A protein has these predicted regions:
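The feature marks the mature, well-folded catalytic cores of soluble enzymes
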Residues: 1-187
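Phosphate- and divalent-cation-binding pockets in alpha/beta enzyme and binding domains
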Residues: 4-7, 203, 252
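Predominant activation on well-ordered alpha-helical scaffold segments within soluble catalytic domains
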Residues: 9, 136-139, 143, 198, ...
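Short, contiguous, pocket-lining structural segments
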Residues: 130, 192-196
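Ferredoxin-type iron-sulfur electron-transfer modules in oxidoreductases and energy-metabolism complexes
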Residues: 157, 165-191, 206-313
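Extended amphipathic alpha-helical segments enriched in small hydrophobics
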Residues: 197-201, 246
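Short linear elements at protein peripheries
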Residues: 304-342
Length: 342
């Protein structure tokens, strides 16, 4: 996802360099000219029939054949030719070990190993938050990543690189791009603990129903909301509303990033940013007025059934796709006074 963050592929292509994604999901999206919708399973939203049609057009596969095994073999054959003729290989890093200077790449397809096996030039780029102190720490994180991302004890391939192949070059790029500023932000520093496992997306009720493309930041879900706000709050402020504050993301996070709490803090900052929703501010002000004055609250409860009928007659947007619920004939206060509630 670092390439997406830095918009690396368009830059290289503009320089006349052919870029080929080697992860199968990323390759599918590259051929479709689409962005990833999940940080672990980038093409999870694409149906196999769509992949079949795409490969028929781009790779010359059989017409109408959408068998996953057949399509996988076709992609492997095509990518193998790319691997054999590549002049450079660029990988990210799931982790980097400070004590040994090695980088660690976790995959289930072996594409990282294939990619670096032929070219003499290998480049590894990763964010500074990926650095762990030693191999003992690495062992903990590799298990956390696999189990939280896909439920595996460990990924199929866990590859370590720390020096160039014989006669080759190995360049390591450690990216800041605003991360050092996050380190100085005491309220949101924990965001850098994220290991990009995607567990928060898998459990988020908003993401599961709306998908990755409903967010404006390139990383969707709860972690993407926070990262987007840290990157450019005036541009990505609309994402903070895509959260039910159910706290499920905070509960499942393997590294205990308090995602929901941070989203809640971002919502509190919207007014300072000048991006608070005007209607919500009016409604919140009205609720504050009513809650502090029992007579106003009781009057509102008495008038609520009338308001509901008016809204139903007006055919408001909420009622176009669902039935508007009816208000109870008696509110709680009335039932309490009549002794109906004990």
């Amino acid at each position: 996802m670092l390439a997406e963050e830095c918009e690396l592929n368009p830059f290289l292509e503009h320089k006349g360099i052919e870029v080929v994604e080697s992860d199968l999901g990323e390759r599918i999206l590259q051929l479709m000219h689409l962005k990833p919708s999940h940080i672990v399973l980038p093409a999870i939203h694409v149906k196999r029939e769509q992949v079949g049609e795409l490969f028929e057009k781009e790779l010359g596969t059989e017409k109408g054949n959408s068998d996953p095994t057949y399509l996988t073999h076709a992609a492997r054959k095509n990518l193998r030719e790319k691997f054999l003729h590549a002049e450079a290989a660029m990988t990210g890093a799931n982790f980097a070990v400070a004590s040994t200077g090695e980088i660690v790449v976790c995959t289930n397809e072996g594409n990282a190993d294939m990619g670096v096996s032929q070219p003499k030039l290998q480049i590894a780029a990763f964010g500074m938050e990926k650095i762990v102190p030693d191999r003992e720490s690495l062992a903990v994180f590799t298990r956390l990543l696999a189990r939280s991302a896909t439920g595996q004890p460990v990924t199929t391939y866990t590859s370590h690189f720390r020096k160039p192949r014989e006669g080759g070059e190995f360049h390591i790029i450690i990216v800041d791009n605003g991360r050092s500023k996050i380190l100085a932000d005491r309220k949101h520093i924990k965001t850098l603990n994220c290991i990009r496992c995607g567990a928060c997306m898998n459990t988020c009720p908003v993401y599961r129903r709306s998908g990755g493309y409903s967010y404006t930041y390139f990383i969707p879900g709860p972690i993407g909301i926070n990262l987007g706000m840290l990157k450019a709050p005036l541009h990505y402020y609309d994402n903070v509303s895509a959260c039910s504050l159910c706290y499920s993301c905070s509960d499942v996070c393997p590294v205990k990033v308090d995602l929901a709490e941070q989203i809640y803090l971002w919502r509190q900052d919207l007014d300072k940013l000048g991006k608070a929703d005007a209607m919500k501010k009016i409604m919140s002000g009205g609720m504050e007025f009513a809650m502090n004055r029992p007579w106003a609250f009781n009057t509102a409860m008495d008038l609520a059934p009338v308001g509901g009928e008016v809204l139903r007659m007006m055919g408001v947007t909420w009622g176009k796709g669902r039935d508007l619920p009816n208000f109870a004939k008696e509110n709680f206060n009335e039932m309490w006074k009549k002794g109906k509630v004990k």
